[in-house]
From Swiss-Prot:
A GO-annotated cellular component: cytoplasm
Keywords, alphabetical: Cytoplasm, GTP-binding, Hydrolase, Metal-binding, Nucleotide-binding, Ribosome biogenesis, RNA-binding, rRNA-binding, Zinc
Gene Ontology BP annotations: ribosomal small subunit biogenesis
Occurrences of domain CP-type G (ranges): 112-267
GO molecular function: GTP binding; GTPase activity; metal ion binding; rRNA binding
Pfam families from the UniProt entry: RsgA_GTPase
Cofactor: Zn(2+)
Matching CDD domains: YjeQ_EngC
Disulfide bonds: none
Protein name from the UniProt record: Small ribosomal subunit biogenesis GTPase RsgA
Binding site residues for GTP: 157-160, 209-217
Biological role stated in the UniProt entry: One of several proteins that assist in the late maturation steps of the functional core of the 30S ribosomal subunit. Helps release RbfA from mature subunits. May play a role in the assembly of ribosomal proteins into the subunit. Circularly permuted GTPase that catalyzes slow GTP hydrolysis, GTPase activity is stimulated by the 30S ribosomal subunit.
Amino acid sequence: MTLSSLGWDDFFAGAFQPFASENFLPARVALEHKHACVLLSARGEITATCTGRLLHETATRAALPAVGDWVAVRLRPESLASGAGVALVGDIHAVLPRRTAFTRRAVGDADAEQVLATNVDTVFLVTGLDRDFNLRRIERYLAVARASEAQPVVVLNKSDLHPDARGAEAEVRRITRTAPVVTLSAARGDGIAALAPWLVPGATVALLGSSGAGKSTLINRLLGKQRQDTGPLSHAMNKGRHTTTHRELLALPGGALVIDTPGLRELQLWGVDESAVAETFPEVAALAAECRFPDCTHQREPGCAVRAALDDGTLDPTRWASYEKLQREQAYAARRVDPVLARAERDRWKKIYQGQRARERIEGRWE
């Protein structure tokens, strides 16, 4: 196994330079446990833990090693003296800068970020063409994927379970705009070849989707063997049972790397800026640019192009509602981590409240 086959390139080589002369090895995180990581390197597989210094100096849990990360690891003396075939053990001293990162707000914690996958070139957003099919969820996944700076590809799985798979694909294409859409059946193998443009040697692809979308079945198909266990299909729910319980980096026979992730029961926004939401809803962004006032809130202002488009039917109200929801969530998440934005929001509502009180006093004088 070579570094280039693991996705190593000039970007990571440059970041590793400070460690090159200190007996460190570059390695990639393939599996993350609570207290240790399994790393892949040119020397083979390494089981490693973070040094106390790294744990102490790292500001947040999200900055510690995650699946897909490149790290600087130093082998322990017993591993340096061991011969071939002996398990290697080391210590992780640093996490190299991430080129991309797919994150979400940690479940049950409004102020914590959870890293799902890093250094990903392409994100396969897997959704099933069964009861899992949800256009609004796809919009949410697209916004988060675009914020990660990886290329999103919408994968519509279980085409054999939908009476009009091509019709469903057309619906998705209307909301994805520039993102590619691939329709396939991982169970039967139909359409798998359409994923080939993104599964090139050294490329890293992450599979993300809700529980039961068929990600494990798709990985088994790509691997050409039954490696990921899959749960039996619940005919009552028409939904596969979620079976992946951890994130893992796997090498495909053709040389690509794939990161499997557990099914996402929720995907709260984190680190998603306004541009990622706007890119997901380009028709809304284009209309907003035509409003009379640059700070138009698209509520009651005169000359609002968005309200006009909603009134005449040229803007889909379900798209607008989805845009508003994601925009509010994005703004809320930004305020949670930026005290300046939080203070500005408090000041804005203070002015609104003071204005309402002033109007009430004026109106009261005339009663």
